[in-house]
Curated annotation (Swiss-Prot):
GO terms for biological process: development of primary female sexual characteristics; development of primary male sexual characteristics; positive regulation of fertilization; single fertilization. It is a multi-pass membrane protein. Belongs to the LHFP family. Expressed in all tissues and cell lines examined except brain and peripheral blood leukocytes. The gene is LHFPL2. The keyword Transmembrane applies. The chain crosses the membrane at residues 11-31, 102-122, 132-152, 181-201. Plays a role in female and male fertility. Involved in distal reproductive tract development. This is LHFPL tetraspan subfamily member 2 protein. The keyword Transmembrane helix applies.
Length: 228
């Protein structure tokens, strides 16, 4: 018989697992990993004060995507073009970024699978006599390792020509030059930290759903068990 077991710790682990998966996915797809040096609407560096140049903007560059100002649009606020600069995997600007894309994609795929499974842990807590929480926690730890590898390799690609075009000639491996780090990079780092927190917290979710109080509720014949 299926028993629906909901505890604070198991629900918190489920919510965190979903949040982490979405955060990493959004960061990976974003173009806001590097914020480029200021440019004018025509794509060149703006002149100094009083130079009469158009209002400057900051282009952004991601692993495979970028955001630039559309030079043909003059009177609309939404004149930024965002999309992939690479039409295929081989066109990603750096070999390091290609490796980053692979590691992040594998890690995110694992996190998404765990997030999906975590929803069903309210009804099914074990499979083949193995705790789903412990298995998911192990998978989250593995995903975290893939994410770390991707994030370590990503700055090594800052010396590629694409990054130099956005960040100036001083850009090199692990030196962003005139660029600053965007919110997507920090989101990916934060998501990686939360991934390991989820991996550790999965053990608490397992303890909460297999406690003596839960067993007492099951023995009383209850199918819906909610415990704080």
């Amino acid at each position: 018989m299926c028993h629906v077991i909901v505890t604070c710790r198991s629900m918190l682990w489920t919510l965190l697992s979903i949040v982490v998966a979405f955060a990493e996915l959004i960061a990976f797809m974003s173009a806001d990993w590097l914020i480029g040096k200021a440019r004018s609407r025509g794509g060149v560096e703006p002149a100094g004060p009083g130079g009469g140049s158009p209002e400057p903007y900051h282009p952004t560059l991601g692993i495979y995507a970028r955001c630039i100002r559309n030079p043909g649009v003059q009177h609309f606020q939404r004149d930024t073009l965002c999309g992939p600069y690479a039409e295929s995997f081989g066109e990603i600007a750096s070999g390091f970024w290609q490796a980053t894309a692979i590691f992040l994609a594998v890690g995110i795929f694992i996190l998404c699978m765990v997030a999906l499974v975590s929803v069903f842990t309210m009804c099914v807590q074990s499979i083949m006599k193995k705790s789903i929480f412990n298995v998911c926690g192990l998978l989250q730890g593995i995903a975290g390792l893939f994410l770390i590898l991707g994030l370590i390799l990503y700055p090594a690609g800052w010396g590629c020509q694409k990054a130099i075009d956005y960040c100036g000639h001083y850009a090199s491996a692990y030196k962003p030059g005139d660029c600053s780090l965007g919110w997507a990079f920090y989101t990916a780092i934060g998501g990686t930290v939360l991934t390991f927190i989820c991996a550790v917290f999965s053990a608490q979710a397992e303890i909460a759903t297999s406690s003596d109080k839960v067993q007492e509720e099951i023995e009383e014949g209850k199918n819906l068990i909610c415990l704080l």
